[in-house]
């Protein structure tokens, strides 16, 4: 069992209008492996939070629960709405999940069609769809790419388009899995600037501790399916015992 560390009295902020509340979430895979063991987490409007920990800690499993791809035991609420089978389409429109590999997210011939896919399947009028696509591409600074072929883009460009595909749904929460993986320094810097400027509540799973240090005021550490630390990033990065215990390195 991992050591639990108390790192900050500000770890679980009290606020009105919580964007995300996870309560005592448990999940085991069909082979019996226990991936989540009582995870609780709270994000408030405007929070930008890093989720770190070793491989197998449960980070990706947790993220897949936030829009109902996986369904464990416990409660997940998005903007005050409890995730249930009946409101699953609504929750999925409220949680923008961006996978580590953008090729898992981009499957249409053109950038426009990829970004328009979600709004079209919401049944929105054509004018609203076009407006959302334009706004999403502008947010990721890819307006000039709307007619480009998605599969011809670089990895960094694909990652930005993948973010646009969920921004076009106007989500309450943006969830990203390893967004900086595989990027060269220029593309990584572009991504950091983009994430910094996006005015949206954000939970980001990453092994990039320099990214954590630069971008996220708050960090949550997971290990063996549990939240073992939750606090101010500056405090966590100075806690050498914590970092060592959970296979993390100070940037």
Model-found features: residue ranges?
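A short, surface-exposed alpha-helical micro-motif characterized by mixed small hydrophobic
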Residues: 212-214
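Conserved ABC transporter NBD signature motif
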Residues: 74-83, 91
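The feature captures the beta-strand-to-loop junction immediately N-terminal to the Walker
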Residues: 52-54
């Amino acid at each position: 069992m991992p050591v639990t560390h108390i790192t900050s009295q500000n770890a679980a902020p009290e606020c009105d209008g919580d964007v995300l509340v996870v309560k005592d979430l448990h999940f085991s895979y069909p082979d019996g492996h226990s991936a989540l063991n009582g995870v609780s987490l709270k994000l408030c409007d405007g929070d930008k939070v890093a989720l770190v920990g070793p491989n197998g800690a449960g980070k990706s499993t947790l993220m897949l629960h936030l829009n109902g791809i996986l369904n464990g035991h416990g409660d997940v609420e998005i903007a005050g709405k409890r995730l249930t089978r009946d409101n699953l389409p609504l929750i999925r429109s409220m949680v923008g999940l961006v996978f580590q590999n953008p090729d898992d997210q981009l499957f249409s011939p053109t950038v426009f069609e990829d970004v328009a896919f979600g709004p079209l399947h919401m049944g929105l009028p054509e004018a609203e769809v076009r407006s959302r696509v334009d706004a999403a591409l502008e947010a990721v600074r890819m307006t000039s790419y709307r007619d480009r072929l998605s599969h011809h883009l670089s990895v960094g460009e694909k990652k930005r388009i993948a973010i646009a595909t969920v921004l076009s749904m106007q989500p309450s929460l943006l969830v990203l899995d390893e967004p900086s993986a595989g990027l060269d320094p220029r593309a990584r810097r572009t991504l950091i600037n983009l994430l910094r400027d996006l005015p949206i509540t954000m939970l980001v799973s990453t092994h990039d501790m320099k990214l954590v240090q630069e971008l996220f005021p708050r960090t949550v550490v997971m290990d063996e399916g549990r939240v073992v630390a939750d606090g101010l990033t500056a405090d966590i990065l100075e806690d050498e015992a914590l970092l060592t215990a959970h296979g993390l390195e100070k940037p």
